[in-house]
């Protein structure tokens, strides 16, 4: 059974103090070495233990990373879970399987299927790209996905039978007369629906949307339906030279290097209790992209600078809106 990466998984390396060990990215030592080290016996204990989930976390995040390329309707298969093994020299100790999950809940850890997609509002503008991610920790599971509301208004079937995970990419078509996009997952080919995700199509009337990897490893989005403000801050580097009346190039003070920090203040629309309860998934995400829908849906890597995520506490609070502060993650420099 696969284990969520947040959950501690400890390997017993025996009674030798300073026991050398190696971790591989396969169920045996034919895989790549991702870590080598030594484990020591702690005071009061008789065995040397090592906690391996912290060791595997960074590797797993890269291995199961999402490819942010919107190229029409396509799908991409990548491992839904990763098996690791531990060896003492050439002696096998144990193996285990992790999947990328930071929900910190035990409820879904023993299920074959998980639900990595849960957009906060479920609203998507016409023309926006979207991704449906399905994670299967069990190697015996298979997916049958169907995508509705295509340009010709008919349903289309993608008979994807995989062992692992599926990313289904598409765009909300601008000319579609439908008001909803439905992605249905079937248990088998007998049309027995096991999972259904409905996205509400709205007109393209907002400039920005945020895409983010949620706590279950899926890629979700939130249309920014409130006000927004963009600001550039400048860190200027200057030096002084002799001013020459006859040569304008010798102008005195010279601005030779400007570092530009671009930030946005974004405001959501009004959110219900259930929607506001999922804002922590966005504000706590380490991987966030700002989509500029007025610039061919360009994705810009950003970091969220909010220091907290307040939740609604009283019924009288009514609906709630959030201010989200983001900063462009890449450097902008002018020389």
Question: How would you label these PLM feature ranges?
Answer:
Residues 1-201:
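Preference for solvent-exposed, low-hydrophobicity sequence contexts
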């Amino acid at each position: 059974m696969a284990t969520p990466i947040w959950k501690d998984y400890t390997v017993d390396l025996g009674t030798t103090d300073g026991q050398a060990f190696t971790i591989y990215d396969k169920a045996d030592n034919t895989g790549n070495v991702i870590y080598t080290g030594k484990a020591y016996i702690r005071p009061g204990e008789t065995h040397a233990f090592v906690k391996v989930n912290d060791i595997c976390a960074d590797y797993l995040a890269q291995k199961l990373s999402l490819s942010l390329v919107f190229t029409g309707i396509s799908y991409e298969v990548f491992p839904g879970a990763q098996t690791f093994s531990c060896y003492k020299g050439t002696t096998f100790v144990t193996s285990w399987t992790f999947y990328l999950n930071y929900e910190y809940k035990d409820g879904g850890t023993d299920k074959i299927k998980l639900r990595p997609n849960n957009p906060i509002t479920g609203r998507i503008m016409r023309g926006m790209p979207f991704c449906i991610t399905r994670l299967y920790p069990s190697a015996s599971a298979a997916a049958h996905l169907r995508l509705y509301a295509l340009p010709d208004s008919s349903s289309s079937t993608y008979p994807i039978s995989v062992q692992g995970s599926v990313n289904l990419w598409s765009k909300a078509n601008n000319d579609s007369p439908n008001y909803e996009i439905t992605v249905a997952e079937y248990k088998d080919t007998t049309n027995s629906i096991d999972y259904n995700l409905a996205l509400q199509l709205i007109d393209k009337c907002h400039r920005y949307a945020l895409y983010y990897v949620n706590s279950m490893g899926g890629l979700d989005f939130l249309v920014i339906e409130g006000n927004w403000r963009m600001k550039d801050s400048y860190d200027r580097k200057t030096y002084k030279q002799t001013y020459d009346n006859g040569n304008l190039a010798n102008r005195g003070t010279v601005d030779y290097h400007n570092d530009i920090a671009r930030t946005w203040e974004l405001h959501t629309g009004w959110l219900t209790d259930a929607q506001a309860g999922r804002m922590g998934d966005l504000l706590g995400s380490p991987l966030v992209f700002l989509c500029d829908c007025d610039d061919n849906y360009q994705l810009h890597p950003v970091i969220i600078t909010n220091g907290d995520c307040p939740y609604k506490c009283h019924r009288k609070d009514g609906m709630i809106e959030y201010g989200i502060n983001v900063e462009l993650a890449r450097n902008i420099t002018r020389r």
